[in-house]
Every structure is written in C-alpha cells, then in structure tokens.
C-alpha cells in the first residue's frame, strides 16, 4: 500500500474492508464495505477506525459510512385455486427446508382472513414490533422470520374486511424489515381475489409454486390459479402433489383416497415441471398442529420437503 494512501494508517485487517478513506481539513471519511457483516461486527469496525484515526493530529473528526450491496430478494408465491389442499403446510415446510439448505428465508402469511402460519411455526404468542412505520418480522425457533395477520389480530378474532383493506394489510406484511432475506415465501390464500391481485401488481413474484391434491376438482382450480400467474407474466416454477397416498401405520398398505398421479399428469399436459409429492401422513398433520413442522427434523417427510426445496434453489 502506498504511503500516500490514507488507508496505510489502518492495519491490514481494517484496510481490507475500507473501500475509500479521505482526510481533508481535519475531517476523515471512511467508506466501509459491510456486505455480509452483522451489526456487532459493523460496530466493532466503526469503533476501531474511529479510535485509530482519532489519535492522529491531523484528524479532528471521523465519519464512518457503512455500505453493502442490496440483497437481491426473490419472492416465491405458494398458491392454489382452492382451500384445504395443504398449501400453508407446504409453504412453511418449504421455508424451513430452504433455510436449512443455506438460504436466508422469510415467510409471509398472506391469508388475511384465515391465517395459520403462527400455529404451524409456533409463534402464536409473538407480536411484531415496528420501526420507521414498518413491521419487524417475528422470529420463529426454526430460523425463519414470519409475519401474519394472526400476529396482529386478537386470538379468534374474525377479520371482516373488504378487498382494499385486505390488500393494504398484505402490503404491510411484505413491505417490512426483512433484512438480508434472499427468499421470501408468500403463502397465498385460496382463489384468485383481491389479495392475489394486490401482490401481482405491487410485489410481483419471481415465480409461483402451485399446490393441489390429485383429485380432478382440485386440479381444475389449480389450473385456474396458474392462468392468473400467466396473465401477470409470473412464471410457474412447478406443481406439487399434496396428500399423495396414505400409508397405513398398522399394515403399511398404501391407499389413495384422493386419487394418484393426477398432478404429475396435469403438469405434463400443461408443460410445467412436476416438483414432487407429499404424502397424506399423520405425522405431517400432527407436526403442523403442534408447531413442529417435519421439515425441521430428519425423518422421511423432511426429505420429501428438502427434495422440493432443492429444486426451488436450482430454479
């Protein structure tokens, strides 16, 4: 390092983080590349630079400016054309599986009228705080921050709002302090109403995952949801077949109460990727009700969610 470079005043460990250091008329300004640093590390670097430069006779004032590249956050919508197909369970478990694979993942419960993520992620008693008029997501014990109307409304309170109010609520949940989150999973309500339109218009997703059971009625509605994303030029990442086969815990026999293979066949017909199957399993239902999603464990169902999450990571 040149002796005329003010960065020579700093030890190499600090100088490596300083992109620019100027000293003029007694005022020192250090521009620090803070990408990837936590708040404590940033504070330590600022203190060290201030202390070192403060000992110089030619420096009467020091200002340290932290800069970092803005996180390129992808919004992935999880949707279906109808309720009761396990969309919220899939969204929560995919968020956890993606987090375990190394992503920084946040989860928005966009089902304004029937929020379920606080129960699934065991955050029912948490209340989000606000900073600068924006909500701060609730931290779950699975490493996935989450925001839901269930965190804001009283337990059991019915949300009787017209469409514009629901759309405004969604905006507050998405436009929150998500920090360095690189993937934001949005658990959409069933159907193709105001909440979906608000999201597509204001927070256009990078892609969408469609969830359906194998039965024909659910598939018809899933295809309808797919058309909505097509009209908004949002690519459909693929389809997931949920409740795909029930394994009897006593005899091990597999039955198909909702049919079998319908979603994969629909994906082929629509020329869309088939992302995988999630079985109709008591453990998955019990885990969701108990706030202990199976994707957080190491069982066979965790592997099913991890396999789908891996395909999302590669997309």
Language model region names:
Residues 74-109, 226:
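Walker A/P-loop phosphate-binding motif and the immediately C-terminal alpha-helix
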Residues 176-178, 196-217:
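Inter-motif core of Ras-like GTPase G domains
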Residues 98-160, 167, 174:
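Phosphate-binding loop that captures ATP/GTP phosphates
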Residues 18, 53, 72, 83, ...:
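Residue-level signature of catalytic and energy-coupling elements of molecular machines
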Residues 2-7, 15, 34-37, 43-47, ...:
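C-terminal lobe/tail of nucleotide-utilizing enzymes
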Residues 9-17, 24-27, 33-61:
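Short, non-transmembrane amphipathic alpha-helical segments
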Residues 84-93, 115-116, 188-196, 218-221:
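Short glycine/serine/threonine-rich phosphate/pyrophosphate-binding segments
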Residues 149-165, 169-198:
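Switch II (G3) loop of P-loop NTPases
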